[in-house]
Amino acid sequence: MRVSLSSLQRFFSSPLPIKQIIEACDHIGIETEVETLLTCSFSSIITAKVLKTVPHPNADKLVVATLFDGQQEYQIVCGAPNCRPGIIIPLALPGAKLHDHEGNAYTIKKSKLRGVESQGMCCGADELGFAHLQTTERGLFEFPENTPLGESACALLADTFIECSLTPNLGHCASLLGLAREITYVTNVDLVLPPEFVCTPLETITKETSGQDQHLCPIFCCVKISGVSAQASPQELQNALGGLKQKSINSIVDITNYIMLSLGQPLHVYDANAVDIDSLHAQKAQKDEPLKLLNNEEVLVPQGTAIICDKDHTVGLAGVMGSLDSSFNDATTEIILEAAYFLPSAIRASQTHVPIHSEAAYRFTRGIDPNNVLPALYAAIHYIQKLFPNAKVSPIQVLGSTPQASTLSFRTELVGKILGMPLHASQVRDQLHSLGFNISSEENSILSVNIPSYRHDIQEEIDLVEEVCRTQPWKVENKKAPAIYSPMYSLKRRVVDFLANSGLQQFFTCDLLDTETAALNREEADCISLQGSKQATVLRDSLLPGLLKSTATNLNRQAPYVHAFEVGTTYTKKSSKYQETQSLGIILSGQAEEISWISHERPLSFYSIKGWIERLFQYLHVSSQAYAIQPYEHANFHPYQQAEIHLHKHVLGRFGTLHPQLCKKAQIKHSVFFAELSLDSLLHTQKKALHLYKPYPIYPSSFRDITLTVHESVPADSLRKKLLSFHSKWLESVSIISIYQNKNPTTQNKNVSLRLVFQDKERTLSNQEIEEEHERLLAMLNAQINDTKGTID
């Protein structure tokens, strides 16, 4: 949203420096950028009044004008169509430097045009660098009638503009009034309404229409005004709209736009001859129907979409845009002016079905002030009557009523608890009151807070805490220890910190997937309807589709490799209800590392993804004896390169090489290795034990290697864990050295070589002690290996 500083200052009881305004916006959470337009010379371009004009003797399209700057007269040859006696315009004197439409500089000089001397040049706003104030092509800029003569034209036109980036929760700031109101909360000025918006109430008639949908539109107002026309707006109104980045159209439309940009209430104008005011109302479309809009675009309005209609036909998309057939045009002399409050959810749904965006829709989707509907309509009517003194205004027809303001219970001690410092209830109460919140009652430090009608973002108690915190410049030193994070939050932080610091890139993908991306997962996903999107309709039950799509995008853009992870929410459906699970996904593809003079090309493998899981478990102090890797079968993975992880008899996740057909479907030429773990399961199975660091051993260790013949279906890791389960006091570790399997298809056995490391913490073991312990462990292991099948009992 772009606002001019001069327009914004009119809403303050006293002017504020631009620096203080920017600091206030930053304090309340509004990002701003400042632009100052001052592009021309101060002294050489002045204000002057056209006294008279006569036709040029040698040119049909030129006139010879006499201008007066308050002290002397000038003869100027001018070709602007609006050059006429009585107007005050910018006059560029000899020596003034201007720029043409291509940005090239030129200097004004005395010259003769078709034989007549010209002592300068009459200027348009665009020629002075103020293109936003230019309302007509090749026209002169017209100052108000009370503009002093001989003053610097550039000084009068120069202004500072503030570009505000509003977050969705700050819809109440999408107007000069709303922005000024927020700024006054953190400054020492009061909010005031400019005179044109302070109006006496007009006559209203409350009506009932059978088709009016109160849930869609709680209050709907319209008024008939006759004796108007599509004449051009006064220069003052055109300048005001130009400062708000709005193009002037005609007087009636300009008034409605000015009210919307100033007060935040969208208005719409109909041709009274095309609309029946007595049956005009808001409802949902009963069937699909075509509609041609003001922008000449023909759309199909689906059944259930919010519309405005009378007894005969549809005249507009509610809260978005009117129809072309019912619009105000050059021949209109009688209008119907509409002001209403639509529920934000209804207009958001309409924009989903009919994606037409407008300034009105921008405000309605974020929520406007329902209590401002009638005051804004009063202001528009008074402005129209000012421009058209003979206009006749009928009583305002009101359908419905203003919705009641909501009330929240608020514990004052919650602010101190969140801030981590003591805070008196009176401080909280006074701060809320200064922000426009009325306290209806107070009991035991619990306030009953009435929410202002324009604050649609205040829904819960914590929102009130945020209001107090964001607008109050607290400067109290907090010596209290920070609050303890939830176990899941702490676990996620540890996982993210480790993986990111270890070299993986963190990805963020959307929880909702389009059908094409969701198809990358070979499991069936549950589809849901979402009003915010036509494409993203599948709620993910795995991180795989999003990560796979992101990997394909990066590899197709010539990234040498993708080593990435994501921590996010997945959704499973149990008993017709969705259950949220916090999951970790790791994906590897491409090269193992970037090729350089010191490194060679090394391919990734199944063991690369397995190594990341093991390093993560080691970082999280998950003992290697606590988890088991078991065979697994899933359509997403390569049939012989996948495994499932069990931790304390709970399924923790799965990992492996993705199926080549799946990679081909994702348009990835490289092998892809993927792991997905449930952080919920990991959190629930982790033991809260004190992890102690051990010093390096001072006594030497010894190792013995053994080779066992077992059935090919026996996991090698099960032999390692079986040896560790015997609880030998000297057995320090067991590791797998090699696995050999004969290529002969008739052979169903394999050889597994293990290394056993023996060590005592208090002395050096003798060879005899090591041999005896080694033989004992080997005998115990052989006793559990089935001699006929080679399996472990």
UniProtKB/Swiss-Prot annotation:
Its main location: cytoplasm. Residues 39-154 form the tRNA-binding domain. One of its GO terms (molecular function) is ATP binding. It holds the Pfam family FDX-ACB. GO terms for cellular component: phenylalanine-tRNA ligase complex. Its EC number is 6.1.1.20. Mg(2+) binds at D457, D463, E466, E467. CDD domains: PheRS_beta_core, tRNA_bind_bactPheRS. Its cofactor is Mg(2+). The keyword Cytoplasm applies. SUPFAM superfamilies: Anticodon-binding domain of PheRS, Class II aaRS and biotin synthetases, Nucleic acid-binding proteins, PheT/TilS domain, Putative DNA-binding domain. It is found in: Cytoplasm. Binds 2 magnesium ions per tetramer. It catalyses: tRNA(Phe) + L-phenylalanine + ATP = L-phenylalanyl-tRNA(Phe) + AMP + diphosphate + H(+). Residues 403-481 form the B5 domain. Belongs to the phenylalanyl-tRNA synthetase beta subunit family. Type 1 subfamily. This is Phenylalanine--tRNA ligase beta subunit. The lineage of its organism: Bacteria, Pseudomonadati, Chlamydiota, Chlamydiia, Chlamydiales. The gene is pheT.
